[in-house]
Amino acid sequence: MSVAGGVSKAVERAVVHGCEALQIFTKNANQWRGKPLDHAEIELFRQRIEQTGITPVVSHASYLINLATTFPALREQSIAAFIDEIDRAEALGLLGVVIHPGTCTAGPDDEALRLIADAIRVAFKARPRVKTMVLLEHTAGQGRTLGHRFEHLAAIITHLRGSRRVGICLDTCHLVASGYDITTEAGYRDTFERFDRLVGIDRLKAFHGNDSKRPCGSRVDRHEHIGHGCIGLEPFQRLLHDARFAGLPILIETEKTDRAQRPDAIVEDPLDRMNLDVLRSLQ
């Protein structure tokens, strides 16, 4: 949900749409750092979350961060920005920060996965007492991005000695794009059995609910409105009726209209409403 006009505005927009959970950016996703969160705005956000009962709330980290990079300056900048994301989320009382693991810039994937874990370890040491979790997002697998195999996520967690400060966010579009065919009953069953075996269902803290413009195995990340893409409605219905995922949020990241992005706009976005209504009809 847009934070135009201040983070507390995202809660108002969520209420307009009848949301039960929420994902926000705490700053511009295409900038390294944002201006510090105003204390009054933090308190207003927390009050509105408590009043509305919207939970959980997570943030999404900047797209610029690359915890897998081998370039020293970019690595230092990425880790600093990552810690800033954690600080902002902690100040707002969020469950976690969703982050793409990273993109390999040189060498084998195994070494890049170790670099990701090392960067997370640095952040944990810098902020030893924060409650906000790091939620690794499973990716579509474009280029040399990491995290598109469950084995990648498992390796990062293993390098971190199984830290319980690490959770997972699964994106339905990314699952299909990376080759996990959840569109069939058998494929859905096999995918989550494999995830449980390699990573653990207990690590799963949130879903991104997006259809896919591209077919299974394309390794191209293109979100589509729910029911309008290559995934279809049945997999979402399975998710909503799967007892293992009861209580987990499904956060949509589909295209919005321009009018909902204005700082003064606390209005219903017809595209968000359409996708939410589709999901609710499947419950």
Label every model-predicted segment:
Residues 2-4, 27-29, 61-64, 102-104, ...:
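Active-site beta-loop-alpha junctions enriched in small/polar residues
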Residues 14, 60, 78, 89, ...:
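Conserved, mostly hydrophobic/aromatic
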Residues 67-167, 271:
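Active-site acidic/histidine proton-transfer and metal-coordination neighborhood
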